Amino acid sequence: MDSSDKSNLPLLLEIDWERHEAYTGENIFHVIAKKGWLKMLCALEGLVDEKIKPWLRKWSRDGNTCLHEAALRNKGPQAIRIMEKLIEYGADLNLKSSCHKPVLHVAVERNDYELVAWICQQPGINLEAEDFYKFTAHQLASKKNLNNDKKMVKILETYGAIPRQDGSSEDEVSDSEEKSDSE
């Protein structure tokens, strides 16, 4: 199926997606996000109802939401356009993968500066969300194994990410701030 052609939409809709998900662990939104099929996604607009919206928040067998798949398999403007549509339909940008990785962390790890800047500007985005290892996106960008990506750090700080020491959780930062205020 070509991403520029929505003539295959009827074929896509004929698939038994519940059976497909049971077999592959992916629903229609995971597949579309992975393949980068923006026109297919747009063609679904009138079909996404309250019954379908929970599919936008499901994890695939790999533990990713459709937004994680979009960030993993696409870059820059393509990822942004797909994610905009998925969010419009009801996907949640703050949902973490099954291994507790926020979508913002995926974009940081992939060095997708444009996507990171876009995510940081989204209403309600949690810039201080932590992954399984208690690292924020800012901490990931400033870690040595990511070559202390100064450009990424600057983007995150521009949009309000708070610099903190590696491994300190949000609560620890708040506690240390309270202690210094009371002294």
From Swiss-Prot:
An annotated GO BP: symbiont-mediated suppression of host NF-kappaB cascade
Region (Disordered): 163-183
Keyword match Transmembrane helix: no
GO terms for MF: NF-kappaB binding
InterPro entries cross-referenced by the UniProt entry: Ankyrin_rpt, Ankyrin_rpt-contain_sf, NF-kappa-B_inhibitor
SMART domains to which the protein is assigned, alphabetical: ANK (SM00248)
ANK repeats: 62-95, 99-129
Key words, A-Z: ANK repeat, Host-virus interaction, Inhibition of host NF-kappa-B by virus, Repeat
Family: Belongs to the polydnaviridae I-Kappa-B like protein family.
Role this protein plays: Suppresses the host immune response through NF-kappa-B inactivation. Possesses ankyrin repeat domains required for NF-kappa-B binding but lacks the regulatory regions required for dissociation from NF-kappa-B and degradation. Therefore, prevents host NF-kappa-B release and subsequent activation.
Protein name: I-kappa-B like protein N2
